[in-house]
Amino acid sequence: MIHPEQVADMLRPTTSTTSSHVPGPVPTVVPTPTEYQTLGETGHRTLWVTFALMVLSSGIFALLSWNVPTSKRLFHVITTLITVVASLSYFAMATGHATTFNCDTAWDHHKHVPDTSHQVCRQVFWGRYVDWALTTPLLLLELCLLAGVDGAHTLMAIVADVIMVLCGLFAALGEGGNTAQKWGWYTIGCFSYLFVIWHVALHGSRTVTAKGRGVSRLFTGLAVFALLLWTAYPIIWGIAGGARRTNVDTEILIYTVLDLLAKPVFGFWLLLSHRAMPETNIDLPGYWSHGLATEGRIRIGEED
């Protein structure tokens, strides 16, 4: 027989001594917004200042040719065209017309949640490559004319130079995450640059000796100066545009210094030395100097 108090104890609710684990909330991850690497105020001002310096240099180069006969203005014309093209390029970049963005995927690593990714978009000034594709062949042409390099080697040097610049453009605008593509174009461009050195430096140093010691020394100085500067361009690209180790403003400042040295400074050096050395003159009569005004005239009284 069960005592009534035992029945009451049996009917009372009992509390469990074991506790169940309640899972906590899952950590949330806020997606990282797209990161834009663009030029700042320093880079913008640098582009405008360089544009003004290129325009000023173009005007001075044109004035230097004022008293030079048309038949002997070849170096003046080429040098002026180089800085004119550079002026247009820097105006386009300063106004934001010759620029685009190249995006790459960056991964963010987390401890307790899956990794996430976000886009890193870097500003690329493609107008710079248009400038180089037009002006560097003209610079090579000046060096080859000064040294007396034959047309075949001059053409090969110019073609290799254009390939080098285009490879740099393809690498800069290629798919950001495709490392093989980017550095593949970069490697091809570097090999093309070796061909430029081969045709200009080696063949130029051989042919310029026939023009005398003064011209030989001038060519050697200009060629070493130009090729050292051009060697710096792919190095800077690999650090800035390729590996993205510098900001856009720093990239602009470095390229600006190189462009000013490779174009206005090189041009002043060449033209002032050219004026002091008559043996560097290249006389171009005929169509270059007089056009077609004297062509096709009928001379009466002369035998055929």
Swiss-Prot record:
Residue numbers of N6-(retinylidene)lysine PTMs: 263
SUPFAM superfamilies attached to this UniProt entry: Family A G protein-coupled receptor-like
Residues in compartment: Extracellular: 1-45
GO terms, molecular function: all-trans retinal binding; monoatomic ion channel activity; photoreceptor activity
PTM (free text): Binds all-trans retinal via a protonated Schiff base linkage.
Cross-referenced CDD domains: 7tm_Opsin-1_euk (cd15028)
Residues that span the membrane, as ranges: 46-66, 74-94, 129-149, 154-174, 183-203, 219-239, 252-272
GO biological process: phototransduction; response to light stimulus
Protein name: Opsin-1
